[in-house]
Amino acid sequence: MRFALLNDQRVEATPGAKGVCPGCNAEMLARCGTKKVWHWAHKGRRHCDHWWENETEWHRDWKNRFVTDWQEVPARDETGELHIADIKTPYGLVIEFQHSAIKPDEVEKRTTFYGQVIWIIDGTRRPTDLIQYERMLSENYPERFDGVDIYTVYCEETRLLKEWGSLGKIVGFDFGGDNLCLLTAAQGRSRYLFDFPKVEFAKLISEGKPLPVVQFAKPVRRGYRRRRRF
């Protein structure tokens, strides 16, 4: 975790420091090595939130786009089980940053628990994901809408879309660079993707403004599209 409580203040890890978990009040130790980002770890091996994944520089870079008070916000479900949101805004929106592999049932549970949630997925974890994504776009013809190229694709076209395309929530795929590939809408088997600047994404979230979504219009006749399964 990035923060622990020390004298009732949220602080980041420093060498040799000890603190208290903001969620479960257990003792935490600062881990300040050279291979991983500096972080806090529970004195015991078990994290109080079993949904938690080890934080990477990628997680930290994303969290840094938002104010610290919105980071690592704890909440309990109806059974008293603790969960810690990566980002939770005062407007009730949760953003989860997912780097490691995750089981579909856990995604569903976390999505149901948070309700109003956006998932940001690290698209660089598997080398084949970017290859599949770029190939998919090269075999599709975008439509121009308000100056944005919108691609109509299908879940079976890439592994990432198979995993995340039917969630029914906004999903952003981060392949590095300055833009997110946003999936904000679906219609039947179709999914609609477009690039959106990360800076603008964070700005809209921080201001409590909605992200752009695809507005469905009357279908247009398209040329032949090659289809490929992965």
Write out the residue ranges for each language-model feature.
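Short, conserved loop/helix-junction motifs that constitute active-site signature segments
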Residues: 111-114
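Nuclease-adjacent, charged terminal/linker segments that flank catalytic cores
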Residues: 1-71, 77, 211-230
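Short hydrophobic alpha-helical runs that function as membrane-insertion/retention elements
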Residues: 116-121
